[in-house]
Amino acid sequence: MSVATSTNSAPPSSLSDIAQQFASGNPIISINPLGNGNINSTFLVQTNPIATAPQRFVLQRINAQVFRQPELVIQNMAVLTEHLKNNAAPAGRRWETPAIVTTQSGKNYWQDSAGEYWRAISFIENAQPVETIQNVEHAREIGYGLARFHHLISTLNTDRLADTLEGFHITPTYLATYERTKQQADLTSKTSSDIETKQRQHCLDFIAQRQEWAHVLENAKASGQLKLRPIHGDPKVNNILLSKNGQAVSLIDLDTLKPGLIH
């Protein structure tokens, strides 16, 4: 078996043992780092079932420094998987959502001897991310993927979802932190270069010109004009996978699935 590790991965022996928990008893052919995410440690595991072709799944160690309650991330994923069983995408166009791969004992996660939480999800085959918008058609597909996913989860009751990153999208909170930091900082430091000074002033001006809008969404939520809906909290361009013909086929990185404002 081939095991390639990254600098933030678990030791090869324990990584193999953990992957085996999700492999349904099948031999593991390889384990390799997957993607360029900065939060979780992510690996692509390939197994070799006796009766079928090789199969692959994604293995992740959830970063408990970011997600303080990893079990809630996994719980949300389980709720999503269950919801989509009865709310499949319309026929006529491919669309897939990663689903939970359970352990041999039927659990949604595995906790190792160090207390780390590991989970496995299905791998979306024949699709890949693109880091930046390439053209108008690509932008259209990104929009389609974002809309398709949120249409599918629109009937999911937000009471069933935990808020895995409380305050993640609350702009006034960030603005308040910025104001405190600005008051404490020495903005007249003579050690900065002219370029740094201009860049800093550009940022200060940018925020000053827009800060009156920072409370709009939260005020609308408080007044009942907007309500919480199930959302993907981090729908970056490279979280939408494209098929070989350029069509959006999946929205991945579902750790930030949570109640929020879709606006």
Regions found by a protein language model. Name each.
Residues 2-7, 32-36, 60-61, 67-71, ...:
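ATP-dependent phospho-/nucleotidyl transfer catalytic cores
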Residues 24-49:
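ATP-binding glycine-rich phosphate-binding loop
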Residues 68, 242-263:
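Active-site Asp-x-Gly
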